[in-house]
């Protein structure tokens, strides 16, 4: 593995452990060139469906886009990076279980919102406001009123009530 500090190609593994509910292996490495340490994550290569955008374009599934969108919605909320990663991993598993070659962005967005609503209601509303592109305050208010009708398993006040 190439060292991110000096570019040297040889290293040794100092520590290795399971990460992300067994979905990845976290390895702590030490460069044999500069002796600095860095962390890598190894995960199974998964075959994910192609994403069909609203305009009909198709592109490969990009986990990073979902992580970034959820992280933006969770800014200044009591939601950890690990919780965000777990949420996105759950969405990926759900998509894989469908067994489809292609999936529409709508289905991905709905899967994210379903999990985000259980994790943190404020982050859910933030994500929904961008994802659903409300045309007016009335649509936004309808969504907020829907939060009053709790889903089974949702936490009162989201995670903000810790």
UniProtKB/Swiss-Prot annotation:
The keyword Metal-binding applies. GO terms for molecular function: ATP binding; DNA binding; zinc ion binding. PANTHER family: TRANSCRIPTIONAL REPRESSOR NRDR. Negatively regulates transcription of bacterial ribonucleotide reductase nrd genes and operons by binding to NrdR-boxes. One of its GO terms (biological process) is negative regulation of DNA-templated transcription. Binds 1 zinc ion. A zinc finger (unnamed) spans 3-34. It comes from the Bacteria. Keywords: ATP-binding, DNA-binding, Metal-binding, Nucleotide-binding, Repressor, Transcription, Transcription regulation, Zinc, Zinc-finger. It comes from Anaeromyxobacter sp. (strain Fw109-5). HAMAP family: NrdR. Its cofactor is Zn(2+). The keyword DNA-binding applies. This is Transcriptional repressor NrdR. Residues 49-139 form the ATP-cone domain. Belongs to the NrdR family.
